[in-house]
Amino acid sequence: MPAIPSHVPEPSRTDPALIRNFCIIAHIDHGKSTLADRMLQLTGVVEQRQMRAQYLDRMDIERERGITIKSQAVRLPWAPSHDKGATHILNMIDTPGHVDFTYEVSRSLAACEGTILLVDAAQGIEAQTLANLYLAMENDLTIIPVLNKIDLPAAQPEKFAEELANLVGCDPDDVLKVSAKTGLGVDVLLDKVVAEVPAPVGVKDAPARAMIFDSVYDSYRGVVTYVRVIDGQLNKRERIRMMSTGATHELLEIGTNSPEMLSADGLGVGEVGYLITGVKDVRQSKVGDTVTSQHKGATEALGGYKDPRPMVFSGLYPLDGSDYPELREALDKLQLNDAALVYEPETSAALGFGFRVGFLGLLHLDVIRERLEREFGLDLIATAPNVVYRVIMEDGTEHTVTNPSEFPEGKINEVYEPVVRATILAPTEFIGSIMELCQTRRGTLLGMDYLSEDRVEIRYTLPLAEIVFDFFDQLKSKTRGYASLDYEPTGEQTSSLVKVDILLHGDKVDAFSAITHKDAAYAYGVRLVAKLRELIPRQAFEVPIQAAIGSRVIARETIRAIRKDVLAKCYGGDISRKRKLLEKQKEGKKRMKMVGSVEVPQEAFIAVLSSDDSAGSGKGKK
């Protein structure tokens, strides 16, 4: 094991020529967090006895699902083997790898000069890794291709080294082969980072400019903002200004992560560290924003800042109505740590009080829902996720619809729905079933490339609404789990969409309304009324369940009335006597039907709205 450097330069006085900022791009489960663990051990910033697996993934849900959700930055001192005298500072920025968090990934990449492209030697490159690799190439980062898990019996390093070399445009021999688990080759990799990743370039005497690439909420210190200094220097106790909001704060503490927080007197050009200003709301320090000094500050912000826009909406309702204040408090707390989460209160006649919540994508929705249930102990019903539609009426007015109940009645000119460009990577034998699935989901083929003789990249334009429900599950089952999917929004298109309402006994039940394509509306209506017929208990009167588009009914099932045997007391006897009793019963049922109302049991809502149940019978199926 290499010697731990004895002299580590101060963050405010480090020569930028000795700094290397890099990140690791990898697919879920390709060993990124394990590689980060080995680097922490090799550089000696974490003692052997304090080491635990996935050291940087702090949230339980991150450790359990094996995914990274929040970016982390760690300062690692390293003396390369060819030059023991010069201690270099390696800033490793750990990025989320999932498609929902692409904006965070792009900001993390903008804070680096180089990236390690980490690929599992037993599985090869996946769609999300490919998407992040293209992002890295757009940011002109130096790419170091690495194959991990070469100690696995199933590893095929030669085959995948060739695939990587073709993608990155290097020689297959230049692809490093490491095992993060055993630590094999990790020191060579760190030497290569020092040798190949360029040093940060910045003007030391210019006004300070630093880019925020992440912010987290700490219950004791408020918001901790992670920044990369581009120009100038930020010092403790000076006043700083956020360039997108114009808000000013005092720097109470500044420092670096190694991986625990170490305060310093300032951060110089090229350094990566944290700022604490005592602010209590993450939305005050937005990812991608530029921080500068209030006195003699910079006039021009760094490019690339975007406000995160929710793509998928879902209603969250507490099972027990009295939990509503707890749900509000829980969402407030989560929003402190997640600026992309938006929500507003809404009421549903069927489900009571709840919130309409906007998410970046399906994983984001899943993670938030799981955190609400686990960390705050809430039992929730989530309505089927839906996307944002733009409806233009014949009189030219425009409506934005995030909830099926907001879909306007009357004469509609056109409806716009968001579309995404999806990239699917899969073995070539599954091309047919993947294309069939995409066609049923109203997809348009954009192109197809063979990465090697047995792996193909298929590109489709698909409506986002067709993906948000169960597309990924269907894709996995059709390809025996081998396909991987990545998507990015590419605007909107006009579609013939309609709103399907479910009527119980003539009354609309808002929780079951859905916006679907005209061709799939009939199948959706038939499926839902059949399901409700099984779930709603029989009443003392007949209950029609109807699916309707506007005033046109497209499907109907009837729950027959429970009838008492009124003829039981007639032994034999006259037919007119029996007829009289039956007529009397019929009258009573008719009166009941006039005033009766149908109670939909909670289980019926849960069964219809839970996506697990609908995953088997997706909307696209006929």
UniProtKB/Swiss-Prot annotation:
Pfam families: EFG_C, GTP_EFTU, GTP_EFTU_D2, LepA_C. Its main location: membrane. It catalyses: GTP + H2O = GDP + phosphate + H(+). Signal peptide: none annotated. Residues 17-201 form the tr-type G domain. SMART domains: EFG_C. One of its GO terms (biological process) is positive regulation of translation. Required for accurate and efficient protein synthesis under certain stress conditions. May act as a fidelity factor of the translation reaction, by catalyzing a one-codon backward translocation of tRNAs on improperly translocated ribosomes. Back-translocation proceeds from a post-translocation (POST) complex to a pre-translocation (PRE) complex, thus giving elongation factor G a second chance to translocate the tRNAs correctly. Binds to ribosomes in a GTP-dependent manner. This is Elongation factor 4. It comes from Streptomyces coelicolor (strain ATCC BAA-471 / A3(2) / M145). The gene is lepA.
